[in-house]
Curated annotation (Swiss-Prot):
EC class of the enzyme, as a word: hydrolase
GO MF term list: cobalt ion binding; magnesium ion binding; mannosyl-3-phosphoglycerate phosphatase activity; nickel cation binding; phosphatase activity
Alphabetical list of InterPro entries matching this protein: HAD-like_sf, HAD-SF-IIB-MPGP, HAD-SF_hydro_IIB, HAD_sf, MPG_Pase_thermophiles
Protein name: Glucosyl-3-phosphoglycerate/mannosyl-3-phosphoglycerate phosphatase
Function noted in UniProt: Involved in the biosynthesis of glucosylglycerate. Catalyzes the dephosphorylation of glucosyl-3-phosphoglycerate (GPG) and mannosyl-3-phosphoglycerate (MPG) to glucosylglycerate (GG) and mannosylglycerate (MG), respectively.
Family matches, as Pfam families: Hydrolase_3 (PF08282)
CC terms in the record's Gene Ontology section: cytosol
Assembly mode: Monomer.
Gene: gpgP
UniProtKB keywords: Hydrolase, Magnesium, Metal-binding
Active site positions, chain numbering: D8
Cofactor(s), names only, from the UniProt record: Co(2+); Mg(2+); Ni(2+)
């Protein structure tokens, strides 16, 4: 039986403020020792994820921009993959809408409403760095978006409802992460997780899926797996928008909770 772990990054595997994953090192080492695939499933861009792939030597498929696409290293699976095309060293399954169209819709909404909406595409790397706390190099990578626009909406609840209405009217969708709203196409983390899980099932037959997240944009992913975990927010609370009967609440904020969840589930089970 093959166990697979899907994980959010910001606020989950990596700390919300420091972007460090040091607190999760014991669990990361355990997964490597047991050869359990760790699949990044996040709002981050492909360019950002490649940094973590190299740093953690985690050469598995990954899911970028809230399920915008699955990037599978060439020759990773022995089975034939369907509905894929090649980009660089990857076989890619796309679910998302082009960034150009998404930006156009967001700009139209801003013009129609006059609301203060600021997306990554409105900022230079220095602006993204200041807003996120990322260093300049990381901020540049965060701007290389393909399927999703992260934005801030500095308005009241009525304005938020209006923006959501206009996003839907344009045939697009939205979600909310730890820091930003996201406008995107007909994709979410859950669709990508289910598609990638099916590929693993074709390869290994029996598969058990695990996922860890912290925010609303993780809910589709958490619904799509066998064992879902929710880690605590920086204030020590769990996101109240995550309503799922089978959810397991990891004790600890971000990577501390992530580490505890994996060590409890994997470290104490000799059969895994």
């Amino acid at each position: 039986m093959k166990h697979i772990i899907f994980t959010d990054l910001d606020g989950t595997l990596i700390d919300h403020d420091t972007y460090s994953y040091d607190a999760a090192r014991p669990a990361l080492d355990l997964l490597k020792e047991k050869e359990i695939p760790l699949i990044f499933c996040t709002s981050k861009t492909r360019a950002e994820l490649e940094v973590y792939v190299d740093e953690l030597e985690c050469h598995h498929p990954f899911i970028s921009e809230n399920g915008g696409a699955i990037f599978i290293p060439k020759d990773h699976f022995s089975i034939e993959l369907k509905d894929v095309h090649e980009i660089g060293n990857y076989k890619v399954i796309e679910f998302g809408t082009s960034y150009t169209r998404i930006r156009g819709v967001l700009e139209d909404i801003r013009k129609k409403t006059g609301f203060k909406i600021t997306g990554f595409g409105d900022l230079d790397a220095e602006g993204v760095s200041k807003d996120t706390g990322l260093d300049i190099r990381s901020a540049k990578l965060a701007k290389l978006r393909e399927y999703d626009e992260a934005f801030r909406l500095e308005e009241d609840e009525n304005a938020t409802a209006k923006v959501i209405e206009l996003i839907h009217a344009a045939g697009l969708n939205y979600t909310k992460g730890g820091r930003y709203w996201h406008i995107m196409g007909d994709n979410d983390k859950g669709k990508a997780v289910r598609a990638l899980t099916e590929i693993y099932r074709q390869q290994f037959t029996e598969v058990v899926t695990i996922a860890l997240g912290d925010s609303l944009n993780d809910l589709p992913m958490l619904k799509a797996v066998d064992i879902p975990f929710l880690v605590q927010k920086p204030d020590g609370k769990y996101d109240p928008s995550i309503i799922l009967t089978e959810i397991k609440h990891a004790e600890g904020i971000g990577p501390v909770g992530w580490n505890n969840a994996i060590m409890d589930l994997i470290g104490k089970n000799n059969n895994i």
